[in-house]
């Protein structure tokens, strides 16, 4: 019997936020919806994050209309997901409990199925109220443990050590992340997401965390990452092999680069591994037909230029060259053997073949989320100040 892997599609929220500064209009979303109903994703992230802000600020649209229109089109085929900043909800300052209560109630009544709840500093107190009210009104509370790495402190010199200064003690250990996940599970979380918004987690680390979470927490585990620094696809493969329950992906023309890995590449890996995602890839191909044109429209309206797009690829109808097919096998074998360098190398070669962006060393060093990077690029373009981007990234 084939193992099942659930797929959360991010295209209409994190996908467009990471690659196109969250400027996808309702009319553009509507063009994709008839095919999403047939795609059979476990979940679709469509709301929260920067979507409500951008919908009002830049598009002069109603964010509640966005959610309700998608729910009307998709029904209960896929659970609609939103990203909430804990007590801040979709804003940038904390709200009192009565506001959180009413917001969660209205969200679920408008069609929301899953609320992914996070605090950027992993402060569990800041997610408590949202978990409570989401569950109270019949929603699924998806609590996210935010992945990060320790600051890069220089090793103390000889005289500093003489004065008693010690080496930096690691904070963000496996035990730290597991403890946060356990605290969130104790609050009533229905699932836990390892949320790597900057794409910094390498394959070996995510495999370790997935196994640790699965062993110690009795609820499903989701993995969310980005491809910006060049780990995303390899890390998703490692998470799948380690036994993760859900992975987050984007459709082809909104995938990779600053976004999440492509469902099409994950589909190829899963097929080779004998894993069933339940996703209707014929419907995904129809979504991609729309997204290809929308991508061109957004490149012009957001960035004022046409950006290179990946080679078209439909895993149901296109035959991979033998050497590329062999790279998928090599990546799987390397991930199963815990050969991190070989896994990353094979996955990067796969991405390069399809014309996806090369790893962004600026983002890798600055350690910032892909959505923040794409928004910064768009804002500097608007200000005609693109030349300061490298310096800004250095300062970050």
Question: Which sequence ranges carry the predicted segments?
Answer:
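Catalytic cores and adjacent flexible loops of soluble metabolic enzymes
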Residues: 1-116, 120-395
């Amino acid at each position: 019997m084939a193992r099942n892997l659930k797929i959360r599609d991010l295209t209409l929220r994190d996908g467009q936020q990471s690659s196109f500064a969250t400027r996808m209009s309702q009319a553009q979303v509507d063009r994709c919806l008839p095919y999403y109903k047939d795609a059979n994703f476990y979940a679709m992230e469509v709301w929260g994050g920067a979507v409500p802000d951008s919908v009002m600020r830049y598009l002069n649209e109603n964010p509640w209309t966005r959610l309700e229109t998608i729910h009307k089109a998709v029904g209960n085929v896929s659970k609609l997901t939103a990203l909430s900043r804990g007590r801040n909800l979709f804003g940038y300052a904390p709200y009192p409990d009565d506001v959180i209560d009413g917001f969660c109630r209205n969200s679920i009544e408008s069609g929301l199925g899953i609320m992914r709840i996070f605090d950027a500093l992993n402060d569990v107190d800041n997610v408590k109220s949202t978990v409570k009210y989401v569950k109270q009104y019949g929603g699924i509370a998806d609590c996210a443990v935010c992945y990060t790495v320790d600051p890069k402190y220089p090793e103390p010199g000889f005289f500093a050590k003489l004065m008693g200064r010690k080496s930096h003690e690691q904070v963000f250990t496996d035990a730290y992340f597991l403890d946060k996940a356990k605290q969130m599970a104790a609050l009533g979380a229905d699932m836990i997401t390892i949320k790597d918004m900057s794409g910094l987690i390498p394959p070996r680390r995510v495999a370790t965390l997935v196994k640790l979470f699965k062993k110690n927490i009795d609820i499903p585990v989701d993995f969310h990452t980005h491809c910006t620094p060049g780990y995303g696809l390899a890390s998703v493969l490692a998470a799948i092999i380690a036994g993760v329950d859900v992975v987050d992906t984007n459709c082809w023309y909104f995938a990779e680069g600053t976004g999440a890995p492509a469902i099409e590449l994950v589909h190829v890996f899963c097929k080779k591994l004998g894993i069933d995602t339940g996703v209707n890839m014929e419907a995904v191909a129809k979504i991609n037909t729309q997204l290809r044109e929308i991508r061109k429209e957004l490149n012009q309206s957001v960035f004022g230029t046409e950006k290179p797009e990946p080679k078209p690829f439909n895993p149901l109808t296109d035959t991979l060259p033998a050497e590329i097919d062999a790279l998928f096998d090599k990546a799987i074998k390397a991930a199963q053997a815990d050969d991190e360098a070989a896994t990353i190398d094979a996955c990067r070669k796969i991405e390069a073949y399809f014309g996806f962006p090369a790893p962004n060393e600026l983002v890798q060093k600055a350690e910032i989320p892909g959505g923040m990077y794409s928004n910064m690029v768009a804002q500097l373009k608007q200000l005609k100040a693109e030349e300061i981007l490298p310096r800004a990234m250095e300062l970050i």
